[in-house]
From Swiss-Prot:
Superkingdom to which the source organism belongs: Eukaryota
Signal peptide: 1-22
Described purpose of this protein according to its UniProt entry: Probable neurotoxin.
One cellular component (GO) term of this entry: extracellular region
Organism encoding this protein: Ixodes holocyclus
Tissue and organ distribution: Expressed in salivary glands.
Gene: HT1
Protein name: Holocyclotoxin-1
Gene Ontology MF term list: toxin activity
Main localization, broad class: secreted
The entry's keywords: Disulfide bond, Neurotoxin, Secreted, Signal, Toxin
Disulfide pattern: C24-C40, C32-C57, C36-C60, C42-C70
Length: 72
């Protein structure tokens, strides 16, 4: 059972690294809802206030027809 748990935790860590990526050498600094291709395009972008305080969009998520947009 401990091997299964170790493999599961390792897989979760790997997925987090893939989703969030490693450090960006040249952040794109795009705003929220801007088109992007990787999370580095959105990193260090301007903060926005959507009514719940300042938010910085850091993730590049796919939504429509394979197009990706910067989201929080």
């Amino acid at each position: 059972m401990s091997k299964v748990t170790t493999v599961f935790i390792g897989a979760l860590v790997l997925l987090l690294l893939i989703e969030n990526g490693f450090s960006c050498t040249n952040p794109g600094k795009k705003r929220c809802n801007a088109k992007c291709s990787t999370h580095c395009d959105c990193k260090d972008g301007p903060t926005h206030n959507f009514g719940a305080g300042p938010v910085q969009c850091k993730k590049c998520t796919y939504q429509f027809k394979g197009e990706a947009y910067c989201k929080q």
